[in-house]
Amino acid sequence: MKLDKYAVGQRYAKALFSLAEQEQQFESIHDEIQALETIFNDNPKLGTVLTDTTLSGLKQRNLLESLSNDFSTLMQHFLSLVFDYQRMAEMPYIIAAYEDLYDQHKGIAHAKVTSAVALDDDQLAKISQSFAKREGLNEVLIESVVDPDIIGGIVLESNHKVIDGSVKHGLDQIKSLLLK
């Protein structure tokens, strides 16, 4: 059975995460994962190039080595394993899955806060602290979005949860009740 890219990402990320913890390189591997993410974002076709059968294996290996020269031995071995199993095209999925595991371990969540007007840093910090406390998290990293259509209030989205405290949502609920 062929695994989808998401499942591949999960498996490889779990293995790397576990090994990083075991080798007490948790933070340094996370830093290297972030560096890899930047490399793959800057070069979106890199994974495809490293799995392309029309290129010689030696050229691909040399490219991989030049890419990973500044990384730890653990990360170099991991990248070599991913390369040997021809999974470099799935590297963005591996990176995303590793970031998710890291965030879970550290008690970090990402949230999108939508408001009718731009919120200042103090307001965003209060929302972040309040949501972190409510959810038992250490930190909530907020992306702020302005959408005048919500009229007022905020809509917070995080980890498949939506807390809709917008005026538009309240008006829609009242309208729904009146039309019954």
Swiss-Prot record:
Domain of life: Bacteria
Molecular function GO terms recorded: proton-transporting ATP synthase activity, rotational mechanism
Keywords, ordered alphabetically: ATP synthesis, Cell membrane, CF(1), Hydrogen ion transport, Ion transport, Membrane, Transport
Annotated membrane topology: Peripheral membrane protein
Gene Ontology terms: cellular component: plasma membrane; proton-transporting ATP synthase complex
Location of the protein in the cell: Cell membrane
Any Pfam family hit: OSCP
Principal location class: membrane
InterPro entries in the record: ATP_synth_OSCP/delta_N_sf, ATPase_OSCP/d_CS, ATPase_OSCP/dsu
SUPFAM superfamilies: N-terminal domain of the delta subunit of the F1F0-ATP synthase (SSF47928)
UniProt subunit comment: F-type ATPases have 2 components, F(1) - the catalytic core - and F(0) - the membrane proton channel. F(1) has five subunits: alpha(3), beta(3), gamma(1), delta(1), epsilon(1). F(0) has three main subunits: a(1), b(2) and c(10-14). The alpha and beta chains form an alternating ring which encloses part of the gamma chain. F(1) is attached to F(0) by a central stalk formed by the gamma and epsilon chains, while a peripheral stalk is formed by the delta and b chains.
Family assignment from sequence similarity: Belongs to the ATPase delta chain family.
Function noted in UniProt: F(1)F(0) ATP synthase produces ATP from ADP in the presence of a proton or sodium gradient. F-type ATPases consist of two structural domains, F(1) containing the extramembraneous catalytic core and F(0) containing the membrane proton channel, linked together by a central stalk and a peripheral stalk. During catalysis, ATP synthesis in the catalytic domain of F(1) is coupled via a rotary mechanism of the central stalk subunits to proton translocation. This protein is part of the stalk that links CF(0) to CF(1). It either transmits conformational changes from CF(0) to CF(1) or is implicated in proton conduction.
Protein name, UniProt field: ATP synthase subunit delta
Species name: Latilactobacillus sakei subsp. sakei (strain 23K)
